[in-house]
Structure formats: C-alpha cells, structure tokens
Amino acid sequence: MRCPYCQYEDTQVKDSRPAEEGAVIRRRRVCSVCGGRFTTFERVQLRELLITKKNGRCEPFDRDKLMRSVDVAVRKRNIDPDRIEQAISGIVRQLESLGEPEIASEKIGHLVMEALKGIDDIAYIRFASVYRDFRNASDFHDIIDELSKGIADTESRFDE
C-alpha cells in the first residue's frame, strides 16, 4: 500500500487485528522510507452499489461520503465515534443485503435517520433538516413534535 506521507509504493504491516466484531481488519502500517505510521481498514464489499440521486443521476456508493454526512450531523455532540462507526457499518450491511444493484438516495437518508434517532435527537434533527430540505422554523417544530410523540409512545409502552 502506498504511503500517504511520501507516496512510496511499499509499506509494511506491523500489526493486524479484527475490529467491529470481526467485520473489519485493522492494520497498522509503517513506511520503510519516511517512517510514517498510519492505519488502514479492510472491509468485505459484497457488491458494487449504485446510488440513484433525486435528479436521476447514478453514482457509485461512497462509504466515506456517508460518514462525512453523518459527521456533520453529530459535530460537537458528545457521541462515541465507535457508535457512529457501528451505525454506518449497519447501514452499509442493510444496503448490501437489499440485493438491489441501484438504491435511491432517499433510502439511504431514511436508514441514516433511523440510526440517528437511536443515537442522538439533536443529530437526528440536524440530519433531517438537510435530508428533508427544511425551509422554515415550522419544519423544525414538526420534527421535534414527531420525536416527542415517539418518546411519549415508548414511555407509555413501559408504563403498561
């Protein structure tokens, strides 16, 4: 693997170990030329996924792009990064298990919303404001009401 610091073509693996409950291999690498150390992750990719955007354009699924969009929603929130990584991995597994070669971007947005709802209400609202294209304050009010109703429904089930 190429060194990200000096671009030398050959680096050495110093340590390999399973991560994310065995779904990923984490490798620590070192460059023999500049001594730079870095980590890589190896994941199974079941199939190449294509994402159909709202405008009809297709593009390859990009896990990093998904991670960046979730990172924006959780920015400055006290959320364990491992929890976010697990959520992203779960979303990717769900997408791969659909068995469809093309997936609508709306489906991904829905899966992210469901994942964030279980992690952090503020991150959920932030993501929803972009995903649902909020135009005014009443859109925020509606999603907060939706969240509050969901919490009240959950609490009433525990009271029974």
From Swiss-Prot:
InterPro entries: ATP-cone_dom (IPR005144), NrdR-like_N (IPR055173), RNR_NrdR-like (IPR003796). HAMAP family: NrdR. Residues 49-139 form the ATP-cone domain. Its cofactor is Zn(2+). This is Transcriptional repressor NrdR. The keyword Membrane does not apply. One of its GO terms (biological process) is negative regulation of DNA-templated transcription. Belongs to the NrdR family. Negatively regulates transcription of bacterial ribonucleotide reductase nrd genes and operons by binding to NrdR-boxes. GO terms for molecular function: ATP binding; DNA binding; zinc ion binding. Keywords: ATP-binding, DNA-binding, Metal-binding, Nucleotide-binding, Repressor, Transcription, Transcription regulation, Zinc, Zinc-finger. A zinc finger (unnamed) spans 3-34. Binds 1 zinc ion.
